[in-house]
Amino acid sequence: MKEGIHPKYEDITATCSCGNVIKTRSTIGHDLQLDVCSQCHPFYTGKQKVMDTGGRIDRFQKRFGSRIGGKKG
């Protein structure tokens, strides 16, 4: 391999807004600030909620409920 053509691979710290600190290595060259991580994201914490805004699911079921999974007739 040629010398001096590859970026430096350095230790960095990624800090989440929840306070979780992740130490890793990267070529980015500076520390990162994260909005979410696996410690605070609802998908990973099991606190994920399904929001039915304005009864849209009910309205969809009324319009297309009989057609879904049923036989055409």
Swiss-Prot record:
Name the domain of life. Answer: Bacteria
Show the GO cellular component annotation of the record: ribonucleoprotein complex; ribosome
UniProt key word Lipid biosynthesis: no
Disulfide-bond pairs as recorded:
none
Molecular functions (GO terms): metal ion binding; rRNA binding; structural constituent of ribosome
Listed cofactors = Zn(2+)
Q: What SUPFAM superfamilies is this protein classified in? A: L28p-like (SSF143800)
**Positions bound to Zn(2+):** C16, C18, C37, C40
InterPro entries, A to Z: Ribosomal_bL28/bL31-like_sf, Ribosomal_bL31, Ribosomal_bL31_A, Ribosomal_bL31_sf
Oligomer status and interactors: Part of the 50S ribosomal subunit.
Q: What is stated as this protein's family in its record?
A: Belongs to the bacterial ribosomal protein bL31 family. Type A subfamily.
- PANTHER family this protein is in? 50S RIBOSOMAL PROTEIN L31, CHLOROPLASTIC (PTHR33280), LARGE RIBOSOMAL SUBUNIT PROTEIN BL31A (PTHR33280:SF6)
Q: What is this protein called?
A: Large ribosomal subunit protein bL31
Q: In which organism is this protein found?
A: Marinobacter nauticus (strain ATCC 700491 / DSM 11845 / VT8) (Marinobacter aquaeolei)
